[in-house]
From Swiss-Prot:
InterPro entries: ADP-Glc_PPase (IPR011831), ADP_Glu_pyroP_CS (IPR005836), NTP_transferase_dom (IPR005835), Nucleotide-diphossugar_trans (IPR029044), Trimer_LpxA-like_sf (IPR011004). This is Glucose-1-phosphate adenylyltransferase large subunit 4, chloroplastic/amyloplastic. It catalyses: alpha-D-glucose 1-phosphate + ATP + H(+) = ADP-alpha-D-glucose + diphosphate. One of its GO terms (molecular function) is glucose-1-phosphate adenylyltransferase activity. The gene is AGPL4. It comes from Oryza sativa subsp. japonica (Rice). Activated by 3'phosphoglycerate, inhibited by orthophosphate. Allosteric regulation.
Length: 509
């Protein structure tokens, strides 16, 4: 699917009146632009109907082309929001921040926006954290360390943990996405960031691949104060997102956060007018916010400090209010994007990676996804049947069956194990053969999955110890259950085995 965007519009607020000596030149440019636009309209009127979008992109007013300014990544800084308490992803977030949750066998969610920044050549990156951030901090330090990890030139990656300072406002933790950014606005008055013209606000729990500089360039081309990345969605998912309506130039005219019933119906759009294929436009009649924004630096400072000093959230407060007074533009992203903030969406997105032609592809040689180098040996497979699965490095698979599953690093599957529709996150360490033999001799359960165990529709968190002859199948189709003392939860019918859990021999779940 190709990324779509639309024509530019001018800023909502009138620009400063130019000096008298410049007005004639401005008027001439406007006349040239008007003449060029009229010529473009004539060309479009005569063009074949099927070529409407292509011709519209090809015919650019001469004045606009002359005024176009290429944006360099050195003028952009990004802020990756480390997320809140992660209640929707619990129990995976019981001891870790959302961006630190493993994904795809050997990655973490934070690697997605970090890699998108690197591939977009944006090298000034802040990561804001608050809850359970220890493992996230460690992963960022190991992976994106300027001296030892991915190179950043004159850039940096800095983790900004929530802190309390003097004064009444400094005694609060982050109250939302906008409040988190507000508490660190002073950074953008630092001398080393004096060239930063636009600030990219990113989320740490999405799965997608995006060229952020294309997003920023469209933002500048349209003279936008704020730009919001958005995706087309159908009615079944629309109420889970902030929805927007735009005029013909892409300027946001209405924004509702997670509307229901009649309010939801009022947000329908004819998505075909934005260049989507008919089969997509017929089913996806809503434009949903991705929670990804570009702000002009001065506008961000003005809004969070002056205009909306008590607004805590970008999606539900800042963007809807700013759309009334500022030029807030929509950037339609027509590629794969998934908000994996719930157990169900997280599980389904991971299993979808095993498809023969997955919507998201970790193996792109041009725009790779980076992660921590672990220096592990190749996986060892002995007489196994593995179908449509991803097996990470450093694993031991012995006489087992794996079907449509994701196997994380250092995983161990013993003879007779059957895994289907399962995400196994792996382990943080190896046990020696002597340690395993000693534990088995004492009737204990070593790390990994024991002999003749059958597992279906399950997420197995790190370092889990699952014994012999265990059955994890949720045969009674229980949708929700909490058994922390027994080492598991059930969320949306999916069994989640806890990190470091011990499931004894013969257990049936």
């Amino acid at each position: 699917m190709a990324t779509c965007s639309w024509a530019a519009t001018t800023a909502a607020a009138a620009p400063p009146r130019p000096p008298a000596r410049c007005r004639s030149r401005v008027a001439a440019l406007r006349r040239t632009a008007a003449a060029s636009a009229a010529a473009a309209s004539c060309v479009l009127a005569e063009a074949p109907k099927g070529l409407k979008v292509e011709q519209a992109d090809a015919v650019e007013p001469a004045a606009a082309a002359a005024a176009r300014r290429d944006v360099g990544p050195d003028t952009v800084a990004s802020i990756i929001l480390g997320g809140g308490a992660g209640t929707r992803l619990f129990p995976l977030t019981r001891t870790r921040a959302k961006p630190a949750v493993p994904v795809g066998g050997c990655y973490r969610l934070i690697d997605i926006p970090m890699s998108n920044c690197i591939n977009s050549k944006i090298n000034k990156i802040y990561v804001l954290t608050q809850f359970n951030s220890q493992s996230l901090n460690r992963h960022i330090a190991r992976t994106y360390n300027i001296g030892e990890g991915v190179g950043f030139g004159d850039g940096f990656v800095e983790v900004l943990a929530a802190t309390q300072t003097t004064g009444e406002s400094g005694k609060r933790w982050f109250q939302g996405t906008a409040d988190a950014v507000r508490q660190f606005l002073w950074l953008f008055e630092d001398a080393r960031l004096k060239r930063i013209e636009n600030i990219l606000i990113l989320s740490g729990d999405h799965l997608y691949r995006m060229d952020y500089m294309d997003f920023v360039q469209k933002h500048v081309d349209k003279g936008a104060d704020i730009s919001v990345a958005c995706v087309p969605v159908d009615e079944s998912r629309a109420s889970d997102f902030g929805l927007m309506k735009t005029d013909k130039n892409g300027r946001i005219t209405d924004f509702l956060e997670k509307p229901k019933d009649e309010s939801l119906k009022s947000m329908q759009l004819d998505m075909g007018t934005f260049g989507l294929r008919p089969e997509v436009a017929d089913t996806c009649k809503y434009m949903a916010s991705m929670g990804i924004y570009v702000f002009r630096t001065d506008i961000l400072l003005r809004l969070l400090r002056g205009h909306y000093p008590t607004a805590n959230d970008f999606g539900s407060e800042v963007i809807p209010m700013a759309a009334k007074d500022y030029n807030v533009q929509a950037y339609l992203f027509d590629g794969y994007w998934e908000d994996i903030g719930t157990i169900k969406s997280f599980f389904e997105a991971n299993l979808a990676l095993t498809d023969q032609s997955p919507n998201f592809y970790f193996y792109d040689p041009v725009k790779p996804i980076f992660t921590s180098p672990r220096f592990l040996p190749p996986t060892k497979v002995e007489n196994c049947k593995v179908l449509n699965s991803i097996v990470s490095h450093g694993c031991f698979l012995t006489e087992c069956s794996v079907d449509r599953s994701v196997i994380g690093v250092r995983s161990r599957l013993e003879p007779g194990v059957q895994l289907k529709d399962t995400m196994m996150m792996g382990a943080d360490y190896y046990q020696t053969e002597a340690e395993r033999f000693s534990e088995l001799s004492d009737g204990k359960v070593p790390v990994g999955v024991g002999e003749n165990t059958i597992i279906r529709n399950c997420i197995i968190d790190k370092n889990a110890r699952i014994g012999k002859n265990v059955m994890i199948m949720n045969s009674q189709n229980v949708q929700e259950a909490e058994r922390p003392l027994e080492g598991f939860y059930i969320r949306s019918g999916i069994t989640v085995v806890l990190k470091n859990a011990v499931i004894p021999d013969g257990t049936v779940i």
